[in-house]
Design a protein with these regions (language model features):
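Charged, low-complexity intrinsically disordered terminal segments
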Residues: 2-431
């Protein structure tokens, strides 16, 4: 064998080993949460027990603050007009972090407002995920910079970071003057416009809130900004003392979760919530692909007498592979007593959970392995019966526009559909 061929063979072997390592790092990690157990007592604390809140705080690192004012901001009609008003009123700081952005009316309106406030000497920071917002043009970002907006991209793909290419920042953050916060599943794209009941208008759940929980949302932004730029944002400009003051009756906090070895805060949150429900458990999620452990927790909840219902997307989904992978598990869940519904009018993109009409979450976190293990995610958790009742009401109203999946009928689907579902489920670790 010639020297050139030997060199080529060595290079080929190195490349194969490198790709194998990347694949291994991508699809494997430590042991996730499989059960929530206790010893010598009655079991995991219900959401109505004060120990539940303390346990959640200890296991996720999220503090649930008293003194917040939280409001749902449903669909584009519910979030954008209020968001534009709050941004235009900013006097000191605006921090925006978005995963998904596309050119259009929404992105243009955001740019116009951010430029105007930056020219008014408000410090404006705009952070986007390099993959999710790849369609924002250089001219768009340069236009922001020229007006004084500080712009950064998070996790741009480099050859030396390729093993982390699947780890995206799926977070949605808007904070105005350290006092008003927004999070949820929305982005900067025109298909979030509207009421969520028409084909081209996505169904979305978001929240607008004031109070100490906003400081946690700001801290999540600061962590991401530091990752991208090396600048850790602190001080009274971003974290004013007045931002920690009580402004309402609601207990709430921001769960910010990121990839790690072993179970993630996202998984611990889900496991505690599924185990803490005693009466009702209403889950709305666009990408619902529960793994073996979470399916067992859902089935155990049914055995405890919990009314477990899942609302997910229909064939109007934007990611068919994930939809098929989720449907692969319908028979098991339906047989165990979990009720499953598919939203009919349009793409459902909401990510919410309500347990016992008391413990709720609204945010960016999907019910799949990508959100649990790969992505940075944010969601507002709320411990409040009034807010929980409003979440229950929205969930039940959404069921009016949904089709319940019945086991007998579902079993009659074609062999072709079953095959696609099985093949899609094989990729669940990456979805």
């Amino acid at each position: 064998m010639s020297r050139l061929k030997r060199i080529g063979l060595v290079v080929l072997v190195v490349l194969v080993l490198a790709l194998a390592l990347i694949g291994l790092l991508t699809v494997t990690r430590g042991t996730p949460v499989g059960a929530v157990v206790t010893l010598a007592d009655s079991g995991p604390p219900p959401v109505t027990d004060s120990l539940f809140e303390r346990t959640f705080e200890l296991f996720t690192g999220t503090h649930v603050f008293a003194g917040n004012n939280v409001q749902q901001a449903l669909n584009g009609d519910g979030v954008y007009p209020r968001l534009w008003t709050d941004l235009r009123a900013a006097q000191h700081t605006i921090t925006v972090q978005m995963y998904y952005s596309l050119p259009g009316k929404v992105a243009d309106t955001m740019a116009t407002i951010l430029k105007e406030r930056a020219r008014a000497k408000v410090r404006v920071l705009f952070l986007v995920d390099a993959f999710g917002s790849q369609h924002l043009s250089k001219d768009y970002l340069d236009g922001l910079r020229s007006a004084g907006v500080e712009v950064a991209k998070l996790r741009a793909l480099r050859w030396y970071t390729i093993h982390n290419a699947a780890d995206r920042s799926h977070v949605r953050v808007v904070v105005v003057d350290g006092h008003v916060g927004y999070t949820g599943g929305f982005g900067l794209a025109d298909y979030w416009l509207g009421d969520g009941h028409h084909e081209e208008q996505w169904r979305e759940s978001n929240v607008r809130f004031e109070g100490p929980a906003v400081m946690e949302l700001q801290a999540a932004f600061s962590a991401a900004w530091a990752e991208s730029t090396g600048e850790l944002l602190t001080g009274h400009l971003f974290f004013p003392n007045s931002g920690f003051q009580s402004v309402g009756p609601t207990h709430a906090g921001v769960l910010y979760t990121s990839p790690t070895t072993g179970s993630t805060p996202a998984e611990r949150f889900i496991a505690l919530t599924l185990s803490g429900a005693r009466k009702t458990l209403y889950i709305t999620n666009s990408y619902f692909v529960p793994d073996d452990d979470f399916r067992r927790l859902l089935e155990r909840a049914v055995k405890r007498g919990v009314d477990v219902r899942v609302l997910t997307v229909s064939n109007k989904t934007d990611v068919k592979t994930t939809w098929y992978a989720g449907r692969h598990h319908y028979e098991e869940l339906l047989s165990a007593g979990v009720r499953v519904y598919e939203y009919q009018p349009t793409m459902l993109h909401s990510k919410t959970i309500v347990a016992d009409g008391l413990w709720s979450s609204v945010g960016s976190m999907n019910f799949d392995n990508r959100s649990m293990a790969f992505n940075n995610e944010s969601c507002l958790v709320v411990l409040d019966s009034a807010f929980g009742a409003s979440m229950d009401s929205v969930f039940l109203d959404d069921l009016r526009y949904s089709k319940e999946i019945k086991l007998a009928e579902f079993k009659q689907r074609s062999i072709w559909a079953k095959m696609i579902e099985s093949l899609s489920a094989m990729t669940s670790r990456l979805l």
